């Protein structure tokens, strides 16, 4: 086992199809071959929000409306940037809309990320002591990952890349469970989740709102989500 450590330390493969060096930097991408054609779009077209979640979703959407310019600014950091509504949903999943936490994985902006991806951003905070939410978001979306290259106007591409932002373990290892990262709060998700990195429970229930539950409601209220 000790002979394998240098190799393991050099490269970690995530199910997202992106290789990361031990420093957490992108090295190259490879196609992911576990997704049926149109998989995400078909789920979107048939998705219904659980009635019990509508009030909670609307309350969450008020956070977007109150802070919309912050999310728009992140979208505008790059040509073809991540739509502001999608940035908002990722922010909810990763750090419960806390502007003092990293968009990568929810640790505090007072230091680099503590979990996967660990040690981001690589650059020191511009003010010398604490990262801003904008610095963190730019690193998470556009430096660590190149999400500006996604065609966000296409539903299937958009939803696939939202799931990929989390990871594609459900598609690869648990095809009977739709990722709660997207579908929690809709009829497409009931139970089963990763309770820790690489540890899946078939009985655990994800109680966070899924990104698609939020986006469906936003779209129904006339808020642009980036596709359709």
Feature-to-residue mapping (PLM):
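Solvent-exposed loop/turn segments at secondary-structure junctions
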Residues: 93-98, 108-109, 147-148
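Solvent-exposed, polar/charged alpha-helical surfaces in well-ordered, non-transmembrane soluble domains
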Residues: 65, 69-73, 88, 135-138, ...
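Non-catalytic cell-wall polysaccharide-engagement segments
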Residues: 19-38, 119-228
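Sec-dependent signal peptide recognition
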Residues: 2-12
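N-terminal export signals and maturation junctions of secreted/periplasmic proteins
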Residues: 12, 16-73
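Short, functionally critical alpha-helical segments immediately adjacent to catalytic or ligand/cofactor-binding
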Residues: 81-98, 140
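Second-shell loop/turn segments in exported
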Residues: 52-63, 69-78, 115-131, 201-204
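Short, surface-exposed glycine/acidic/tryptophan-bearing loops
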Residues: 100-118
């Amino acid at each position: 086992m000790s002979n394998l450590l240098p190799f393991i330390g050099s490269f970690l493969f995530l199910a997202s199809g992106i290789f990361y060096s031990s420093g957490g930097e992108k090295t190259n991408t490879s196609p992911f071959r576990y997704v049926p054609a149109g998989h995400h779009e078909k789920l979107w077209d048939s998705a219904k929000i659980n009635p019990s979640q509508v009030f909670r979703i609307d309350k969450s959407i008020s956070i977007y409306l109150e802070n919309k310019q912050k999310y728009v600014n992140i979208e505008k950091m790059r040509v073809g940037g991540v739509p502001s509504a999608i940035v908002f949903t990722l922010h909810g999943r990763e750090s419960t809309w806390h502007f003092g936490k990293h968009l990568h994985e929810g640790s505090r902006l007072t230091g680099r990320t503590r979990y996967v991806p660990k040690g981001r951003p690589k650059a020191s905070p511009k003010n010398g002591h604490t990262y801003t939410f904008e610095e963190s978001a730019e690193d998470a979306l556009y430096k660590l990952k190149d999400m500006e290259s996604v065609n966000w106007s296409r539903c299937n591409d958009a939803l696939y890349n939202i799931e990929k932002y989390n990871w594609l373990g459900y598609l690869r290892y648990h095809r009977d469970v739709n990722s709660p990262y997207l579908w929690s709060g809709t009829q497409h998700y009931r139970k089963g989740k990763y309770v820790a990195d690489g540890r899946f429970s078939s009985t655990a229930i994800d109680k966070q709102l899924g990104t698609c539950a939020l986006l469906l409601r936003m779209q129904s209220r006339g808020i642009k989500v980036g596709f359709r």
